[in-house]
Amino acid sequence: MIRETAINTEATDIKIAQHRTPPRVVDRGDTICIEAFIEFKTKTGPASGILRLIPDSNTPNNCKAWVLMTSLEGITGHEEAIGDHRPTGENYSRTFGDDNWLDLRNKAKAYSDHEPAVLVIGAGQSGLTIAARLGVLGIDTLVIDKHERVGDNWRKRYHSLVLHNEVYINHMPYMPFPPNWPVFIPKDKLANWFEAYAETM
């Protein structure tokens, strides 16, 4: 399966990622390995990955791949509308009397004259993340949830709940958590962030 996928991927220009932690020896799950962040190109778009190497017992002084995880970072020809590609906003301010940003947003949310291209079920972290990513690619996405308010999937849990993993691995695209947030985020703080994220993105 990997060989078949690799043929279609056409990975080229594989190199150590410049703006990540340099290769180092680490302990991962009681396995000592060399860990390296990589970046490369594919025929679909730019990609990144993490490679973990362990000693090869069959070949002295050589290593073999223990873990290889990759992520497609973009799609060539369908770049995200961020940074230099972001919208200017000029079309909202130059013509007085026409619809402004809020008018257009409310019309788009009503779906009275069109259907969404994508329907996402669940306004939790994954649902909001995919909707934000698709939105930045210009793909009309509607998110629905069984709860009345975005964030209620956390808000309605037990009173003392905080996230069980650290803030550093829970960031959402385009709007990372503020740097002064606690390492373990309380449920209501996270719920309110989800609600603000949905409105902003």
Q: Which residues does each PLM region occupy?
A:
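Glycine-rich active-site loop/strand segments that organize a redox cofactor
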Residues: R155-N192
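Short, solvent-exposed loop/turn segments at secondary-structure junctions
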Residues: E73, S126, E148-R149
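Short beta-strand edge/turn micro-motifs at domain boundaries
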Residues: E39, K43-K107
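Feature captures the FAD/FMN-dependent oxidoreductase FAD-binding
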Residues: R20-W66, I185-M201
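N-terminal FAD cofactor-binding segment of flavoenzymes
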Residues: R133-Y168
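Short glycine/proline-rich turn/loop motifs
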Residues: W101-S112, M172-P179
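A solvent-exposed, acidic/Ser-Thr-rich amphipathic alpha-helical stretch
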Residues: M1-D30
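N-terminal Rossmann-like FAD-binding beta1-loop-alpha1 element of flavoenzymes
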Residues: A108-I144
